[in-house]
């Protein structure tokens, strides 16, 4: 929802006069959905190429899972590069003054989910961006929670040892 809100804000900004002078052909932020429909990956809307991703492959999912707290989440949301102006200047989400709206949609999602396994053990399930676009594990918050409150914390790193383990050691463990 937050990802597509940002897409709608970009579109509306351009429609309402484009004060930031965003070039519609140079929008880098991609729309997303939870259905892997290959026909929606590359579209042309109003003469502009538009791309859809699945949620787990979105920058928004990576940001949610890499954020350490609410302030970190806000900072990362503001740093989303949404595109470029006709003059090749970068435009960030913070330039559209929408960070608080995005944050309000994501603040509860920042909290890990506690579930019970079939063996009656507690498990934290939270996030999971793909390793080809992000760190490929659950959220940093849930890992840190597990490390501070339990005897054992198990983290699954996606995409095998060549990518998943490398990103786990380079990004998550730090």
Model features per residue range: what roles?
Residues 1-174:
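Flexible phosphate-sensing "switch/lid" loops adjacent to ATP/NTP-binding sites
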């Amino acid at each position: 929802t937050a990802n597509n809100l940002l897409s709608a804000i970009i579109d509306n900004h351009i429609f309402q006069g484009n004060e930031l002078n965003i070039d519609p052909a140079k929008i880098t932020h991609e729309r997303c959905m939870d259905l892997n429909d290959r026909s929606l990956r590359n579209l042309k809307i109003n003469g502009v190429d538009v791309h859809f991703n699945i949620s787990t492959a979105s920058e928004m999912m990576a940001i949610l899972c890499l954020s350490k707290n609410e302030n970190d989440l806000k900072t990362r949301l503001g740093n989303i590069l949404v595109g470029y102006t006709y003059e090749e200047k970068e435009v960030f989400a913070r330039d559209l003054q929408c960070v608080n709206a995005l944050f309000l949609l994501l603040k509860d999602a920042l909290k890990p989910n506690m579930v019970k396994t079939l063996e009656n053990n507690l498990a934290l399930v939270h996030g999971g961006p793909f390793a080809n676009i992000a760190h490929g594990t659950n959220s940093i918050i849930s890992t840190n929670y597990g490390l501070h409150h339990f005897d054992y914390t198990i983290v699954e790193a996606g995409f095998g040892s060549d990518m998943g383990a490398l990103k786990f050691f380079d990004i998550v463990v730090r």
